[in-house]
């Protein structure tokens, strides 16, 4: 129905104003009916009886002149004689609705309280209802016999100036209120429109242009969070571009190498060289296969909603299996692996945890000097499980340490890895609600420490 928020807020606000005015009128009408009507009836009846008392004591020569004088004093009067003849004084009534039964009762000396007994009408205020049954009536004795006199104040005449004042006041109130509603709505909508334009810029890929935070209310908070979102999206976009560049590089380099080896293979007839080229191609394709596997694993970790973490894992046994699997690589470098493992159970994803711990051991074997040692420990600590793996090797600079867990980061250009192992390990540990830290001692002993929650109970 509303195509703009501006129109919606403006229409809603104006509707609230008009609806409030209507409800106020109805409530005022109810208040008059239940609280003021009886007292108003009594006051007018008192005035009419005082008029009768004056008429009886002063005995004016022409009673009609007396009623005419009352009419000039802003009263509306209707008299009915015993023949049913009606005479009106003052401003005319809007409608003659008085029943004959009420007239007869007054002629028989019964007071009439039409104002007090006026039925309630939701949208008609009895105070202003200018009809003959909304009057009070008593019997007057004249020289020509009894007459029934019905009277009510002439509200229209009495409050004519006030009604004009009130009408002008209400019109100005509505005009000013609606004008302020439109102006305030525009003030609210303006920053929303700027947000809309900023959103369109985001869609077009502009992550650099911020929006100015102009307020301190909810819209100001929205502006602040929009800027934070813009910064985050910009970082994600940079990471995406960096990721694509790295993947392209990691794939292009071995493919170029394979292409070169195939060319050499075609041109040589030396069996030894041909076998060497074939072996090199096999090694490179194996590395490409490993890269593909790790990229798929990264994608799985980034979209982890479908992953389950309900495997009951015997962590110490898992570590023993990993050590046994990598023992051959350790033996080739004459490395000693020392393991101090407590018996610990853990609830998680066994496949992923196996991958994370394997990456750390493979990394330790790779960077430990020949004849060195690798220390592995697993223990409880309060409500946590602590896993540490330490090895001696070359020192790591603070610059390298700060980027160890970045995707595709390599310590050296001559490193034949793809730089994803530690990034994958960190993601897996965080998905298990754990942390991983790297420390280095003065003796060039590097240590990776994994802390996991003890969730087996």
From Swiss-Prot:
Modified residues (Phosphohistidine): 249
Segments traversing the membrane: 9-29, 164-184
EC class name: transferase
GO molecular function term, any single one: phosphorelay sensor kinase activity
Domain called Histidine kinase: residue spans: 246-456
Membrane topology: Multi-pass membrane protein
Function: Member of the two-component regulatory system HssS/HssR involved in intracellular heme homeostasis and tempering of staphylococcal virulence. HssS functions as a heme sensor histidine kinase which is autophosphorylated at a histidine residue and transfers its phosphate group to an aspartate residue of HssR. HssR/HssS activates the expression of hrtAB, an efflux pump, in response to extracellular heme, hemin, hemoglobin or blood.
Protein name in UniProt: Heme sensor protein HssS
